């Protein structure tokens, strides 16, 4: 932290579908690049260890096990990095598959945050493979170590909340005319179809976006 600020980096690694070892190598490489640039929080895309588009391969035990092996490898090979790191992978828990963000710090796997809102429309069909993490809470064992599913922690004066989600109501947002956006006629109150939904989103503090890990 410098002058009360920390540098947060969002990274998009080059990935290959179902090639967890290659993807982990790219993730590790980018972590060291971001470290050199002073980043203290590093956020990677969901399912970056396996790639998002594995389709029915998500049901293959070999893929799920290799994803965990590479998660441990990422943690071990970045244990000297002074940063909080989030990566995504599929994780089986109690017979169900979850799309989770794993938190890493100094070689430790801190815990997992399962995705809650699963998009299931158009080209998205996550509900075919994954279970919503809305009510899951427990302990996951990887490489004989126990890790908490759902994780909250304070780092000195900084508190982190992690959410992986998509929110269908955002599809109801009004389209904004490019010519008006930011112009003199632009009114941010018109971003929503009605004030009721606007108020609901603020009150519930659920500003979440599809296919994104937030800190």
Labelled PLM ranges:
Residues 1-165, 169-174, 203-215:
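Enzyme catalytic cores with a strong preference for nitrogen-chemistry domains
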């Amino acid at each position: 932290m410098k002058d009360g600020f920390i540098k947060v980096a969002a990274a998009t690694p080059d990935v290959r579908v179902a090639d967890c070892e290659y993807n982990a190598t790219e993730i590790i490489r980018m972590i060291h690049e971001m470290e050199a640039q002073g980043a203290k929080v590093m956020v990677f895309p969901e399912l970056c260890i396996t790639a998002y588009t594995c389709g029915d391969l998500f049901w293959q035990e070999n893929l799920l096990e290799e994803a965990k092996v590479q998660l441990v490898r990422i943690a071990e090979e970045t244990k000297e990095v002074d940063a909080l790191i989030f990566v995504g992978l599929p994780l089986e828990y109690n017979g169900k598959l979850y799309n989770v963000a794993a938190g890493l710090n100094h070689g430790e796997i801190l815990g997992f945050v399962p995705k809650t809102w699963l998009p299931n429309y158009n080209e998205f069909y996550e509900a075919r493979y994954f279970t919503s993490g809305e009510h899951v809470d427990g302990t996951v064992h990887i490489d004989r170590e126990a890790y908490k599913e759902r994780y909250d922690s304070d780092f000195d004066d900084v508190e982190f909340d992690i959410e992986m989600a998509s929110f269908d109501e955002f599809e109801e947002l009004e389209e904004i005319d490019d010519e008006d956006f930011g112009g003199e006629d632009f009114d941010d109150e018109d971003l929503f179809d009605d004030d009721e939904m606007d108020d609901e989103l603020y009150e519930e503090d659920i500003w979440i976006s599809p296919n994104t890990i937030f800190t």
